[in-house]
Amino acid sequence: MYQSNKKKRLWKEEKERLLNMTRDERRKEYREYVSLDKIPSLMEELKSKASSDDESPEEIQVKNSLCEKVSFYKGDITQLEVDAIVNAANTSLLGGGGVDGCIHRASGPSLLAECRELGGCETGQAKITCGYELPAKYVIHTVGPIARGHITPNHKQDLASCYNSSLTLATENDIRTIAFPCISTGIYGYPNEPAANVALTTVKEFLKKNRDKIDRVIFCVFLEVDFKIYKRKLNEFFPKDGGDDEEGEKGDSDEMKEDTEGKPQSPPMKKIKEKKEDTPAPDSPDEEYSAEEATGNTQDMTAMSLETNEGNDVSSPATDPLKEGEELSEAKITGEKISVEPKTPEPEDAKMTVEEKSQEQEDSENMETSQPKVSGETEDLDGDSEEPSDVQKEIASPSNETCQESDPKDTNDDANEA
């Protein structure tokens, strides 16, 4: 009992002594440290890059001041000389593996003694202690969710709460600079990239509402996989031309929502997708026509052939608009599609017979006052658009041959005479 009270008195006295020291005095208490001025902000990195590229740093106009409040560091978090570092702890707060064990070893036994008095911590919450032998003045302990590779909405909510609780606790204790490790990505099994999305999203939203309360947030990574992820995503979440207007914040919110789900898509890619137009597909060589268009085309070509033959001798070959040796003979109509079969050219006598029969039929129809007699041997080959009679409609139904040119019997007789 006496020993316990002595340890309690010791860590309390040590805490009071260290917190009352100035920075220069505290630097005598630890050997290695990385000061804040050695960790540039995103804004300072942009200016440094502009100088190396022979560009004027004054030309860089940053609308989103959050660039000045965010930094990226790869190394040991226990060496950062900031107001507070965040510890990815377990619920007992008594130390463990990973970054938790490193912080406890570097801070000395007084940290463990104070953590015993805190009574543990729930998932998503945070508690604060002194940094003791660390360059950091405070240690904020937070407990991340145990995902084991499978993320649920509760895991996302708990992880976001870790960052929110830590930042809130920092503002309550007048902490202006804070460094975060990658929470829950170790043995707790939270996937690295989705964890980075949650971290960046939550920190950005907090800084928007409390930009005057925090001077610098440092994302400290140790593994190469986390280094590559944060290196790529920091410029997406904290762009130099992000803007503070409502439209820009709305766009950031949509982007962050997608990134939090582990399926990031940058705004430039969205714009490219929106600008893509559907290009028309090239015409197929086997283009299909409707039955009406095919029938009209067949009649027009046949009429053209007949008009050409009117000024020529009967024995002279007719000019065929189709390829030599082919002629539309009949069309098989099936529904709305039609397939055309080639046929060898018929003798000129047969074509003349068709013309004479068509002329006789037309004269006969003009002279009759009653309903005209329709014969299967004749067909309107001039492509006229007159309304057919009921009898003609019945004959021109799909069950009959719509492109019939002449009676096969008469055609064979005329061919023999020739």
UniProtKB/Swiss-Prot annotation:
GO cellular component, one term: nucleus
Start-end of Acidic residues biased regions: 377-389
Catalytic activity: 2''-O-acetyl-ADP-D-ribose + H2O = ADP-D-ribose + acetate + H(+); 4-O-(ADP-D-ribosyl)-L-aspartyl-[protein] + H2O = L-aspartyl-[protein] + ADP-D-ribose + H(+); 5-O-(ADP-D-ribosyl)-L-glutamyl-[protein] + H2O = L-glutamyl-[protein] + ADP-D-ribose + H(+); alpha-NAD(+) + H2O = ADP-D-ribose + nicotinamide + H(+)
Compositionally biased tracts (Polar residues): 295-318
Domain named Macro: residues: 57-238
BP GO annotations: DNA damage response; peptidyl-glutamate ADP-deribosylation; protein de-ADP-ribosylation; purine nucleoside metabolic process
Class in the EC hierarchy, top level: hydrolase
Subcellular location: Nucleus
Annotated GO MF terms: ADP-ribosylglutamate hydrolase activity; hydrolase activity, acting on glycosyl bonds; O-acetyl-ADP-ribose deacetylase activity
Residues that bind substrate: 75-77, 88-90, 95-100, 183-189, 222
SMART domains linked to this entry: A1pp
Chain intervals for the UniProt region annotation (Disordered): 238-418
Activity regulation details: Subject to product inhibition by ADP-ribose.
Feature: compositional bias, Basic and acidic residues: 250-262, 321-360
Transcription keyword on record: no
Keywords: DNA damage, Hydrolase, Nucleus
InterPro entries (UniProt xref): Macro_dom, Macro_dom-like
EC number from the UniProt entry: 3.5.1.-, 3.2.2.-
Database matches in NCBIfam families: PRK00431.1-6 (NF001664)
PANTHER family to which the protein is assigned, alphabetical: ADP-RIBOSE GLYCOHYDROLASE MACROD2 (PTHR11106:SF104), GANGLIOSIDE INDUCED DIFFERENTIATION ASSOCIATED PROTEIN 2-RELATED (PTHR11106)
Family statement drawn from the similarity comment of this UniProt entry: Belongs to the MacroD-type family. MacroD1/2-like subfamily.
Function description: Removes ADP-ribose from aspartate and glutamate residues in proteins bearing a single ADP-ribose moiety. Inactive towards proteins bearing poly-ADP-ribose. Deacetylates O-acetyl-ADP ribose, a signaling molecule generated by the deacetylation of acetylated lysine residues in histones and other proteins.
Record-given protein name: ADP-ribose glycohydrolase MACROD2
